[in-house]
Every structure is written in C-alpha cells, then in structure tokens.
Design a protein with these regions (language model features):
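Alpha/beta enzyme core
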Residues: 2-199
C-alpha cells in the first residue's frame, strides 16, 4: 500500500473545514491502527520515534528516521506528517534531509529552531534555540530542496518558553515569509493561545 500521493492527499485534507486530527504514531502498526479507526492523517513525532526505537530523539540519525518513514508510509494510505527535528544540522544538511524524507512518501515535515545537536530539555522548561536568521536560511533551503510542489514544509518555533510570545510570533512570521506554509508554536498559557488563534498571519 505505497503512499505515492501522500502530499496530494494532505492538501485535500487542508481544504476541508475544521481541524485535521493527526494522531501521533511511532511505527507501522500504530499507524495502521489509527487508519483502521478512521483517522485521516498521522504524525511521526520526534519523541515518539525516539521512544519507539528505544534510541532517544536527539540520537536518531537521518537514515533511521527515513527508514521509519518508509515503513510507515508503506503500511497505510493516509497522509503521514513527520517531525524532522532541527533538520539534522546546517542548511545544507536540512536540504539533504528534505530530499531523503520526501522520497519515503510522507506528506510533509516540520523543522524547528532548536540547536543541533538537540538538547530536548522539555522537562526543564528550557529551549535552546538558534537565531531567527539561521532558521530562516534553513526554511529557504528546505523549500528549495523539495521536488513535489504539494510537499509541505512547516516551520516550528520553540522560543516562546524562554524568549516570550512576541518573539515567537515574530519568528513564525519570518518563517512564513521564508517559504514555510504552516507554523507550529507553543504558547505558554491559554491566553497566549487565544491571541495566537486570533492572528491572521500566524
């Protein structure tokens, strides 16, 4: 059940009203269970991939993630979205990561503005991020690397916990201007979440 048209199917989901419920999966079986329950899209999260392989997200290689993506997309027909972490390095590394992961049949991926190697200090409420300018370059390289126009590049900012809501919004808009089509960010509370939803650009 090869998912050769994952990006196109994801685009169709985006046209529907309401939210897309992309359940988190960590292997082909969990993805197939979701599909059997009527879920329309699944998401391979970095933490889930690390735990599912008993490796830990910061230690996973691009090769290991690409292999996991291949197995998952081969097991289901629904679109698969993937957490590509920091893109495995500098902008050129991001470009290669996008090319390798796109070949697996996934619908798209998101890259984040944390440093590489990633620290994953979520439990300490600390995020180590690169400059906005460096992340903008990564987004541009990611967009340039994709071969399928339907393939979705999402930008993610993790800076709100340490740099504040306003900086997160500034970065999100910068990533959109750099070519990202979607944004993932993490407001610190419900009030910030409401502000985020109320903004047209983010």
């Amino acid at each position: 059940m090869s998912q050769l048209n994952g990006p196109a199917r994801f685009r169709q989901l985006l046209k529907k009203p309401g939210y897309i419920q992309a359940l988190g999966v960590w292997d082909p079986l969990s993805a197939r269970v979701c599909e059997s329950m009527g879920v329309e899209c699944v998401h391979i999260g970095g933490y889930q991939a690390g735990v599912g392989t008993a490796i830990s997200e910061p230690l996973m290689t691009l090769t290991e993630l690409a292999m996991l993506c291949h197995y998952v997309t081969a097991a289901v027909k629904i679109p698969v979205f993937v957490d590509a972490g920091t893109g495995f390095g500098e902008p050129l590394h991001v470009m290669r990561a996008v090319r390798e992961l796109e070949r697996t049949g996934i619908a798209g991926l998101h890259i984040e503005d944390q440093i590489f190697p990633k620290r994953a200090h979520y439990h300490k409420y600390v995020e180590h991020t690169v400059s906005c300018e460096e992340m903008v370059d990564k987004i541009k390289y990611a967009v340039a690397a994709k071969t399928n126009p339907d393939f979705v590049i999402m930008g993610r900012t993790d800076c709100m916990a340490t740099s504040g809501f306003a900086e997160g919004v500034r970065r999100a808009n910068a990533y959109l201007e750099a070519g990202a089509e979607m944004i993932m960010c993490f407001p610190n509370n419900d009030e910030e979440m409401k502000l985020e939803i109320g903004r047209a650009h983010v």
